[in-house]
Regions:
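NAD(P)+-binding Rossmann beta1-loop-alpha1 motif at the extreme N-terminus of oxidoreductases
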Residues: 1-45, 49-52, 56, 179-181
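Hydrophobic packing residues within well-ordered alpha-helices of enzyme cores
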Residues: 16, 20, 39-43, 76-80, ...
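Small-residue helix-packing motif on alpha-helices
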Residues: 29, 39, 57, 73, ...
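Rossmann-fold NAD(P) dinucleotide-binding segment
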Residues: 53-104
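Internal alpha-helical scaffold of NAD(P)-dependent oxidoreductase catalytic cores
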Residues: 99-109, 124-206, 247, 251-255
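NAD(P)-dependent Rossmann-like dehydrogenase/reductase catalytic/cofactor-binding core
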Residues: 193, 197-256
């Protein structure tokens, strides 16, 4: 099994490594020493090895994950000396392969990946570009690896990684709307999140129908489901979601 090194040990590295280990990945994982508290936690609980500096991580790894903050990424990479045959995996948002490659001392294979925090629960739908067999296998430990063959597809897909965080706010709003004297908050929360999980699993298992068609097949005339769905449509409840996605799309275009 290949040796995996992480440059940058923040929250993203933390939940990705937790997911790798909990998913069954047992290869060596090397860490940069920058964030001492998180690095020490990962060394103690998730069988990682803290190196003396970033260059030591690169020197001793086959695959190197760059997981710094975007503003630090290129400067950090430019200071490192890679060797032929290594693979760089970037989980840094907003920096394309051309810019990453432009600061490297070697012409490396570069793969972009976008795990989300559900990786910690081995449930991240991780977007990957370009397809790479080992990188796909790696992120499958954290959930599901989804490969695309164009970088603009990857960039557009990154919007959905942001939508992921909005779901939590929706879960909170629905829990607050349904809890009360007739339903305890913890039961409401479990039902809301369980229904969301069930709906997603049904939609994934029913690719012959769109999610909208599934909704219409359930929310039929005379049902409470239709009563509520019709109100949501009348009130334009879904339009702000479209606008929020368009806002992020515009921001991505400005950053290109």
């Amino acid at each position: 099994m290949k040796t995996l090194g992480f440059i940058g040990v923040g929250e993203l590295a933390l939940y990705t490594i937790k997911g790798l280990r909990r998913g069954g990945y047992d290869g060596a994982i090397l860490l940069s020493p920058r964030n001492r508290d998180k690095a020490a936690l990962l060394q103690r609980k998730f069988d990682c090895q803290v190196q003396v500096d970033n260059q030591a991580v690169v020197a001793n790894s086959d695959f190197v994950v760059i997981s710094t903050r975007p503003e630090d990424c290129l400067e950090t990479l430019a200071a490192l000396r890679f060797r032929p045959g290594q693979v760089l995996i970037s989980v840094v948002a907003g920096i394309d392969i051309a810019r990453l490659g432009g600061v490297l001392n070697e012409n490396l294979k570069i793969v972009r990946a976008m795990p989300v925090s559900s990786a910690e629960a081995a449930a991240s739908p991780t977007l990957i570009y370009p397809e790479h067999d080992y990188v796909r296998e790696l992120f499958a430990y954290c959930g599901n690896a989804i490969c695309v063959d164009r970088e603009d597809h990857f960039n557009q897909g990154s919007i959905i990684a942001c939508v992921y965080s909005w779901f939590f706010a929706l879960f909170e709003a629905l829990t607050q709307a349904t809890q009360g004297p007739r339903l305890p908050a913890d039961v409401a929360a479990e039902l809301v999140m369980g229904m969301a999980k069930g709906a997603a699993e049904l939609a994934l298992a029913s690719r012959d129908r769109s999610p909208g068609q599934i909704a219409e097949s359930i929310a039929t005339d005379g049902t409470f489901s239709k009563l509520g769905l019709d109100l949501l449509k009348t009130e334009g409840a879904f339009e702000p979601w479209r606008k929020a996605c368009k806002l992020l799309e515009q921001q991505l275009a400005e950053n290109d």
